[in-house]
Amino acid sequence: MSEIIHFETLGCKLNQVESEGAASSFKNAGFEISMSPFSAATAENLSVKLCVVNTCTVTAKAEQKARRIIRLLLAKCPKSAVLVTGCYAQNSRDEILAIGKKICVLGGQYKGHLADVPEILKQNPQLYGEELAAFIQKSFETIYKTPGKNQIQEPFRLVPDDFAHHSRSSLKIQDGCNCVCT
């Protein structure tokens, strides 16, 4: 059985499209993809290597829901790391990291780097949980500090090849965000 990458997507259609695009990157790298939302009734899953939570921050309720899902994934996927991205990750990095040691954060401004994570996982198959989260976070921090990389990624990097998990496709025209969160 191949390792599973699980996605939870909150918020707008853009997040849904970008989660599909990131899922395509992982699928093309040989990982199995799960996009069915977890609930309290979901059984523990030891095959999940990484959970990706694409967040929203339009309301305080959206942030609360993101924190609840992050905690749920930490409990239901004990071997996995949890990668949090999106608007909430952009605005509240330290708050999210304080939830647990198996968490890494990729701000929404750098979300295009999700496409780099499959290669990180392939090159480091021995890493799980806390060690994997720390390694991914360190990789992101290197990207943030590299001249020329500390910029918004090409806006269409996470456009999916196909829409395997939705019945309708979306056409991305723009992000609609100038990435100057305060």
Report each predicted region and the residues it spans.
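Proteins enriched for Cys/Gly/acidic motifs involved in redox and nucleic-acid/cofactor modification
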Residues: 1-182
